[in-house]
């Protein structure tokens, strides 16, 4: 697993590739500033999401099948590239959809982003349907230091889309947490969020660089540096590790 953080949340991703080559993901969201009773160090709001976003999507009215992961990279953001097959009529179209996922936390806000890009790699148009999808968990008013909390997940797009050969369909999933009397996070400027995360990663990468003859040691230090720098939260008493 790996953990990533912004100033208002952390996300723990338990992920892997099964024997058939499919990607699996389980997310645990932690909101350090949404305090639970009794108000001790680890008494923060936590919520796990074990849901497959690709399983919600249909291509030609049927579920995507036979995922094959081709590449996984992590540089402070997790990127997964894979292909899916689908059924068209009575025939299976192998590797007809290429999917790219990018996963990262917001730098400043209490939400976590998952970007999805679907590309039609075949020579015929395909019809893709994305459902209206939203999940809301609420806590009792008596359980939180600041009252009731809400943890929510939603998709940025819904509807039916026809992809011509080579075209892409892009959308994102947003996972957020808030006090019940605050406005919900219904959308995000996803380009700005990714840009802010990249800017931080570049700053950390260019500072306090360890250079030794051992590239593995250098990489281990670089990842440890990211983790140490990002896990600083914006508390009511100021920034705190």
Label for each model-derived stretch:
Residues 1-219:
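Terminal accessory carbohydrate-recognition/targeting modules of carbohydrate-active enzymes
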Residues 211-241:
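Extended glycan-interaction surfaces of carbohydrate-active proteins
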């Amino acid at each position: 697993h790996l953990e990533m953080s912004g100033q208002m949340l952390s996300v723990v991703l338990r992920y892997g590739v099964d024997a058939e080559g499919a990607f699996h993901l389980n997310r645990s969201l932690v909101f350090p500033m949404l305090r639970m009773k009794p108000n001790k160090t680890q008494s923060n709001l936590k919520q796990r999401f074990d849901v497959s976003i690709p399983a919600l999507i249909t291509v030609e009215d049927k579920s995507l099948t036979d995922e094959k992961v081709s590449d996984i990279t992590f540089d402070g953001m997790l990127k997964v590239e894979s292909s899916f097959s689908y059924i068209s009529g009575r025939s299976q179209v192998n590797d007809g959809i290429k999917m790219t996922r990018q996963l990262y936390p917001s730098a400043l806000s209490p939400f976590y982003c998952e970007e999805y890009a679907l590309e039609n790699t075949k020579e015929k148009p395909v019809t893709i349907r994305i459902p209206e999808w939203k999940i809301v968990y609420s806590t009792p008013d008596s359980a939180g230091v600041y009252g009731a909390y809400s943890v929510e997940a939603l998709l940025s797009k819904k509807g039916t889309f026809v992809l011509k050969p080579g075209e892409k369909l892009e959308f994102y999933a947003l996972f957020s947490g808030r006090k019940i009397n605050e406005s919900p996070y219904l959308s995000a400027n996803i380009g700005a969020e990714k840009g802010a995360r990249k800017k931080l990663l570049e700053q950390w990468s260019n500072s306090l660089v360890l250079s030794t003859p051992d590239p593995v040691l250098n990489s281990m230090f670089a990842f440890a540096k990211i983790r140490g720098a990002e896990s600083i939260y914006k508390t009511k008493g100021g920034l705190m590790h």
